[in-house]
Amino acid sequence: NSTATALNQKAIARRFAKEQGTKYEELDLIICHLGGGISIAVHQHGKAIDANNALDGEGPFSPERAGTLPAGQLIDICYSGQFTKDELKKRISGRAGLTAHLGTTDVPAIIKAIEEGDKKAELILDAMIYNVAKAIGGAATVLYGKVDAILLTGGIAYSDYIISRLKKRISFLAPIHVYPGEGEMESL
């Protein structure tokens, strides 16, 4: 849920600040939560000032969510008569993203398939990584490129495959620090 993710982001930001010997309120950060949904938030001097609405599928596509979709085509689908409102909501958030393309949200299983030569899985997972990197790059513009650090968190942050490829695309923006896991209960 988005409230828990926001709490997790603040907790991770405070932990990072403490590790750096500074205060959260003195930092400008991009925090990317990599889970069933992918949220990217800009934290400026102790306040979250911008974020995508990952719960409704905005931003990069993820294991369960479609990500930002072309509005015109979405309108066509909505009025096609093929789907109910609930069916469409499930197709955008829950049965979308990696699930729609590869039939699973299991990132380690997808990576294993890639290692065994599955080119489709590699293409889809690399597309997700590309979309995450692009969104993080866009978030950097909110801070005029003056980003103290990029913090990566969530269950997918355990994946060396994803983190290493993400770092290749975004390391020029700011130092990257990885805090794998959800950590949402500790944040409460």
What is each PLM-predicted segment?
Residues 1-29, 36-37, 45, 49-105, ...:
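Glycine-rich phosphate-binding loop plus the immediately following alpha-helix
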Residues 33-39, 156-160, 184:
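Gly/Ser/Thr-rich loops at beta-strand to alpha-helix junctions
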Residues 41-52, 161-171:
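Acidic-glycine-rich active-site phosphate/pyrophosphate-binding loop
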Residues 47, 106, 157, 183-184:
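Short, glycine-/Ser/Thr-/acidic-enriched flexible segments
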Residues 90-145:
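Adenine-nucleotide phosphate-binding core of ATP-dependent small-molecule kinases
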Residues 144-156:
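Short glycine-rich phosphate-binding loop at a beta-alpha junction
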Residues 160, 164-188:
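Conserved phosphate-binding/catalytic loops in two-lobed NTP-binding clefts
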